[in-house]
Amino acid sequence: MGIEEYGGGQGPHSDVLVVTTNDVPGYRVQHVIGEVFGLTVRSRHLGSQIGAGLKSMIGGELKGLTKTLVETRNQAMERLVEQARVRGGNGILMMRFDVTEAADVGTEVCAYGTAVVLVKA
């Protein structure tokens, strides 16, 4: 798998800055908009599940599941950023992911944080 298949995060020219911290050095929070989140639920692919079961017996990375989870997290992030953008934010503080099982048929990934308006300090 190439780097683009198992990584994620923001591009260098995003108009909404997403951080996992309470603040951003060199900026101050002008306005707190509030909580925003991006959510997606992915069903389990039978082929990946069978492959994962076999792979778990011999060990090693479950590449099919890794790729699916990366795509899922990236989609949740895109939705999170869009929510902040449409509410007038240019930053998201304290971004986190929450991953849970969804009714035994899939995986729910939620990216969440606090949308804010940031200005240079």
Curated annotation (Swiss-Prot):
Stored Pfam families: YbjQ_1 (PF01906)
Family annotation (InterPro entries): UPF0145_dom_sf (IPR035439), UPF0145_YbjQ-like (IPR002765)
Similarity remark: Belongs to the UPF0145 family.
Protein known as: UPF0145 protein SAV_4658
Species in which this protein is naturally found: Streptomyces avermitilis (strain ATCC 31267 / DSM 46492 / JCM 5070 / NBRC 14893 / NCIMB 12804 / NRRL 8165 / MA-4680)
